[in-house]
């Protein structure tokens, strides 16, 4: 075909067809260049490639999507990370990730934030530049810093609120029928339950029970995830197009959330700016009120801008709701799946009943109540061990300035993001017997004699602390590690244990008949292991 004929055909195309064609050609050129360009670190080995190779083959790039678990397992066990060596692995789209050995963890955690930044790493990962309209929500995430600063002081007051909200949510979504089994799609229901419970902490009553607000909150979360998938695989030039397109509906939903928040915002502003509010406790203790108090003093421009405050609430929702929903869905599936072998449900019920006998006459929970729930703690940690909530890699950090040198002598360049193969470390056969098996009471059996680890009141002592759900280490990274470990993990701990108590005390659980008593397997999307789509369970209210 002559060039003139090609040009004639192009001329006949409409405007959108021409734009699409140009973007397609540019994408192919950029992808070809990126896939064949030498990485930042030509001296580092490439996982799955021969030693002399300096770029990833297309087949190895495709392994990231269809065989990522095996590829990363090879990088960890066989060749590099476990043996104290850094390695490069293929990542989403055109990108390459640097995996650090476990031996470098303590060094990395000790670096100042202006050298290695977790905030910059998560800003790049979550792409809020597009979904929320600005990178400030992760690069200056003061709404999350407030949780770290104040959670411990409000925790005791938060416990009965979470208990009340979870009880209401389960009754609403699971029902009270004690005669007939009800089939539910588990993750869908847990989205609603988690959204209601976490919103009690974030925005308080009555908004936490407003179905319109809760539905919009989760639509924004799913929209943020869509934006991540639409931008991360590509170079910045392509992201500038795909990011706004993928975030269009999310921005509309954020505007609708803002309408729900406006009356609450005006009410709280009135409290803070009233004379009484200045002299006494200005009222509610939820996160939104904490945010307004902080912004009034430290971020006055944001304090006066409901749009920005709304987006900070959306960022807090993303952290609190999304991963908790995935994790608790896996937890419940694992409990039902292990019940036949370990009598998991009855064992947990016995512990919950025994622990609750030690509460006051009203059955009020305390911090001490949770520390005594060692089997519940073990089952939650075991579920998190096998179902790493952040994909395969953990404790990401981005290098902010040149000249930083790792313990093994790698001169890290500005803009490089380092991470660790967390999920591989958590199923290391040198650390765990039958590491791929869900053993619900693995950690409550950690000592030879559990009774020796309790004080006279049956409370867990320091010997159990290292295996607790909230305890981080280089071998257990669902909540990160070091000074930036997730502060919200303590609320997650409370919420998961209350969920187990509410669910197992008040409901019988089982598999639908077509599952034939077997747990459906998780699915992989790239390096993400997710609950089986559409997984169903049976529930029935117990006659207690």
UniProtKB/Swiss-Prot annotation:
Cofactor(s) listed in the protein's UniProt record: heme
Bilayer topology annotation: Single-pass membrane protein
Lineage of the organism: Eukaryota, Fungi, Dikarya, Ascomycota, Pezizomycotina
Record-given protein name: Cytochrome P450 monooxygenase tenB
GO CC terms, sorted: membrane
Keyword Protease: no
Inducing factors: Expression is positively regulated by the cluster-specific transcription factor tenR and is induced during cocultures with the natural competitor fungus Metarhizium robertsii.
TM region(s), chain numbering: 13-33
InterPro entries: Cyt_P450, Cyt_P450_CS, Cyt_P450_E_grp-IV, Cyt_P450_sf
EC id: 1.-.-.-
Effect of deleting the gene: Fails to produce tenellin, and accumulates pretenellin B. Also leads to the accumulation of pyridovericin.
Family: Belongs to the cytochrome P450 family.
Record's function text: Cytochrome P450 monooxygenase; part of the gene cluster that mediates the biosynthesis of tenellin-type 2-pyridones, iron-chelating compounds involved in iron stress tolerance, competition with the natural competitor fungus Metarhizium robertsii and insect hosts infection. TenB catalyzes the selective N-hydroxylation of the 2-pyridone nitrogen of yield tellinin and 15-hydroxytellenin (15-HT), respectively. The pathway begins with the assembly of the polyketide-amino acid backbone by the hybrid PKS-NRPS tenS with the help of the enoyl reductase tenC.
GO terms classed as biological process: secondary metabolic process
Gene3D superfamilies hit by this protein: Cytochrome P450
Molecular function via GO: heme binding; iron ion binding; monooxygenase activity; oxidoreductase activity, acting on paired donors, with incorporation or reduction of molecular oxygen
Pathway per the UniProt entry: Secondary metabolite biosynthesis
Principal location class: membrane
Entry keywords, A to Z: Heme, Iron, Membrane, Metal-binding, Monooxygenase, Oxidoreductase, Transmembrane, Transmembrane helix
Chain residues that bind heme: 486
């Amino acid at each position: 075909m002559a060039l003139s004929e090609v040009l004639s055909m192009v001329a006949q195309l409409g405007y959108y067809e021409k734009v699409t064609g140009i973007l397609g050609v540019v994408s192919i050129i950029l992808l070809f260049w990126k896939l064949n360009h030498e990485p930042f670190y030509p001296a580092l080995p490439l996982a799955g490639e021969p030693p002399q190779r300096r770029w990833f083959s297309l087949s190895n790039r495709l392994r990231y999507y269809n065989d990522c678990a095996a590829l990363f397992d090879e990088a960890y066990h066989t060749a590099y990370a476990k043996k104290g060596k850094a390695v490069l692995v293929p990542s989403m789209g055109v990108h390459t990730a640097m995996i650090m050995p476990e031996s470098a963890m303590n060094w990395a955690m000790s670096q100042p934030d202006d050298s290695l930044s977790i905030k910059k790493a998560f800003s790049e990962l979550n792409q809020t530049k597009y979904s929320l309209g600005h990178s400030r929500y992760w690069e200056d995430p003061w709404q999350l810093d407030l949780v770290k600063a104040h959670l411990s002081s409000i925790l005791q007051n938060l416990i009965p609120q979470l208990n009340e909200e979870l009880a209401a949510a389960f009754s609403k979504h699971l029902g009270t029928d004690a005669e007939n089994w009800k089939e539910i799609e588990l993750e869908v229901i847990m989205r609603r339950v988690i959204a209601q419970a976490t919103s009690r902490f974030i925005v308080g009553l009555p908004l936490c029970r407003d179905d319109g607000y809760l539905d919009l909150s989760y639509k924004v979360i799913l929209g943020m995830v869509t934006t991540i998938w639409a931008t991360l695989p590509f170079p910045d030039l392509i992201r500038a197009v795909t990011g706004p397109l993928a975030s269009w509906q999310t921005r509309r939903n954020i505007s609708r959330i803002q309408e729900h928040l406006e009356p609450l915002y005006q009410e709280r502003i009135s409290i803070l700016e009233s004379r009484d509010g200045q002299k006494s406790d200005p009222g509610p203790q939820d996160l939104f009120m904490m945010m307004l108090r902080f912004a009034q003093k430290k971020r006055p421009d944001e304090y006066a801008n409901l749009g920005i405050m709304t987006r900070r609430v959306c960022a807090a929702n993303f952290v609190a709701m999304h991963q908790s929903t995935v994790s608790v869905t896996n937890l419940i599936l694992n409990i039902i799946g292990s019940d036949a072998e370990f009598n998991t449900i009855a064992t947990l019920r016995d512990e919950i009943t025994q622990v609750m006998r030690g509460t006051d006459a009203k059955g009020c929970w305390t911090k001490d109540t949770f520390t005594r729930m060692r089997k519940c703690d073990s089952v939650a940690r075991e579920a998190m061990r096998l179902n790493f909530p952040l994909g395969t890699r953990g404790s990401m950090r981005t290098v902010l300035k040149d000249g930083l040198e790792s313990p093994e002598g790698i001169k890290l360049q500005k803009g490089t993001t380092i991470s660790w193969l967390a999920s591989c470390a958590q199923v290391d056969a040198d650390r765990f017997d039958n590491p791929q098996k869900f053993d619900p009471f693995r950690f409550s059996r950690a000592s030879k004699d559990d009774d020796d680890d309790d004080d006279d009141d049956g409370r867990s002592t320091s010997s159990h602390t290292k295996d607790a759900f909230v305890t981080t280490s280089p071998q257990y990274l669902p909540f990160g590690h070091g000074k930036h470990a997730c502060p919200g993990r303590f609320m997650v701990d409370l919420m998961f244990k209350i969920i187990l108590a509410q669910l197992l005390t008040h409901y019988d659980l089982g598999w639908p008949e077509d599952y034939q008593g077997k747990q459906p397997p998780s699915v992989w999307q790239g390096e993400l292991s997710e609950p089986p789509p559409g997984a169903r369970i049976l529930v029935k209210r117990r006659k207690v």
